[in-house]
């Protein structure tokens, strides 16, 4: 799930900060991020065997880039509307979606953590 969040944020970085059309990224980028982005059976087979720190570090690196890029931008950039094919959205809406996406998965992560053997009841 953490790598999925990193993948989502990476794709939105390229779309909003770099001005790339959705899904126009290089084969190298797709090779690294498509499986965690799309999840499903391919992700279940490929994303395993790493320590928690591996996944946290991946998300941290992506997040640091987002924060650095946001520091370069202003409200005018947030309000900028970009149209791709039949879809229009401003950068604020795109990043609001990223935040909502993470919030949703955070709930899933908390749900799963409470069900791990030996987990303490945190009543969050």
Regions found by a protein language model. Name each.
Residues 35-78, 94-98:
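Acidic/histidine-rich alpha-helical segments that form the ligand environment
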Residues 1-38, 81-124:
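Short, contiguous alpha-helical
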